[in-house]
Amino acid sequence: MQFSSSIRQFLDKKRIVEFTKIQQAVFKLWPFQNIIGIAETGSGKTFAYLLPLLDKINTSLDQPQAVIFVPTKELQWQIINILTEIKKYFKTFTFATSFSSKAQLIVSLLNEKYLFTSKVRYVVFDEIDMFLEQSSIQQWLECVHLFQKAKPLFAFFSATLFNQQLQIIKKQVINTKVINLHPKQWIHPLVKHFVVHLNTENRFSGLLALLKHHQNQQIIVFCSNQKSLKQLTQLLSNNNISFGSIYGSLTYQERKNNFTKATNNKLKLLVVSDLFSRGIDLNYFSVVISWDLPKIDSFYIHRSGRVARLNSWGRSYLFWNDQNQSKLNKLIAKGIKFQNVSLTSNGDLKFLTENNQKTTKKPLSTLQIKKIKAIKAKYKKVKPNYKKYQKQQIQNLLINKKKPRSWKNF
């Protein structure tokens, strides 16, 4: 794709001489038709939709022509920072975060007030799967229907988009071309996954061991809810461990300050909620730790995707316990391979090789448990070799159990 001289100057300044696979694929179709782009985290999806969009904006027209909807403030700030850099190479390009502005490009959250304008020709939803969650899908539908009055071209992007979500989009926006460069959506080739096994329930001892092991690297710790986040930050404070944090209940300025520190390499340890797992580029961070597992399985992929961006390696750790065993097994069933890690008596990490890997039994379903109980109930009267027959029946039951449901990837 041939870009304008302004964009070419920006690319030259940033020494971008080669485009990623998702960018090359998107440039052929966008913004000439509706598209859905699916590619792994850190693959360059933002530039994939943003550069062609900027090429089509009429900078002599002082009104909104394109809208980018994002799910979090942090992703909004990141895109604004990128646009601030690009604007230096344009004479009259304007952008804003509010529809009250006459800016040519609006970067907005879905829950902010948005106004319909007939001049909007391009609408992008970044991290679209978050808009399709139960809490926000109705608002998303209303937004799409409103902007469809102007007959714009739509673009939807995410690293994880499954069949049911894909059908929702295609039902609302017809003639949509799917670009799927991430068929194995649960697997990132540059992320190594680890399970930390503890002899006690004290996860904090495991966290301290990880911080010690990666003391020369920058680390993100994810928490699935406000309660666990506050508990962890209190533990870190009590142990005089320096950290920054980003989560929903912080003030706007606190979130903005810590976000700026993290993106400018001013923080060694960052504790965040899952709000921070989407689309954020942190070039200096290489380790992700899940203090607990997210409620939605796919969020784990987005957590681990904060590292291993643009061809750099990353590590993702989680802690094993009885409570998250079933969630862990779901991730394993999706094809994610975990290396087991144990904690030595002196508080160091021991990475287990394939020969001495710990094994974790997959949990039985409620139906399987009922069937096993029924098998055992048959043998109330003791007969010769009854234990052998009983064991064989149970083994046959487990061998013939249904495979876990797999998502259809596109």
From Swiss-Prot:
EC number: 3.6.4.13
Catalytic activity line of the entry: ATP + H2O = ADP + phosphate + H(+)
Primary enzyme class: hydrolase
The Helicase ATP-binding domain, residue ranges: 26-179
Gene3D superfamilies assigned: P-loop containing nucleotide triphosphate hydrolases
Gene Ontology molecular function, alphabetical: ATP binding; ATP hydrolysis activity; RNA binding; RNA helicase activity
Record key words, sorted: ATP-binding, Helicase, Hydrolase, Nucleotide-binding, RNA-binding
Motif (DEID box): 126-129
Helicase C-terminal domain residues: 190-357
Domain of life: Bacteria
Alphabetized SUPFAM superfamilies for the sequence: P-loop containing nucleoside triphosphate hydrolases
SMART domains the UniProt entry points to: DEXDc, HELICc
Name of this protein: Probable ATP-dependent RNA helicase MG308
